[in-house]
Amino acid sequence: MTLVAWLVLVEGGTAFWYRSQESRLPRAASWSVELPRDNATFRESPLSEAAKGLLRPDEVISASWTETGNLQWRVIYLRWNPGRVAGYLAALHTPQLCMPGAGFTLKASSPVKLFASQGVQLPFRGYTFEKDGFPIHVFYCRWEDRPHKEISVGEDPSRLALLRSVWTGRITGGQRVLEVAIRGSADQQEAEGALARELDKIIISNTEKPKH
């Protein structure tokens, strides 16, 4: 067998493997965000070219604004189209990796908690960081468009996680990351309440309906 024929065989077998695994996964759920651009304090906050080059998202929404009561918001929404490394790229953006690089110190983290919004159950993990004596509460959700049994939020971007995702066919599916940072909340509980209210305003759901 020639080298070219061997490469074609390997590539074909790989593609068949991905398709066979994906066909067993649940039907997709689709959602996006719509931020309050009519807020007078709304400001776009583009990712740096270095960050975009590393993460390579297909869609980026990043902005900040201030609400009545002086709650300051920063939201980053990233989306990756289906592809062989979508899951790995999505896992590269987490608060544990990004916030310390901006001078923030991690003070506490909380287990995954589901927040219901527009008919979608979004799994968020909460973090409390501090910089210059001021706390900031960060909530992180990583969403697989065709999720497996386990919740993916907070998975580490290690080779083991990559291989696990490949084995179940999950890594080829579309991926989304939603990170919400809140400054001005008295504590984690107050920040969670503010997050729940804000999600109802900014989440847009377009979940696929089963075909009959």
Feature annotation, model-predicted:
Residues G174-H212:
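Surface-exposed amphipathic alpha-helical segments
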Residues E34-L47, R183-Q188:
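Generic structural signal for short, solvent-exposed loop/turn connectors between secondary structure elements
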Residues T41-G169:
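Short, solvent-exposed recognition patches
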Residues M1-A15:
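Hydrophobic membrane-insertion alpha-helices, especially the h-region
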Residues L35-R37, T68, I171-G173:
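A generic structural signal for short, non-catalytic loop/turn and secondary-structure boundary residues
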Residues W17-D38:
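Alpha-helical transmembrane signal-anchor/signal-peptide segments
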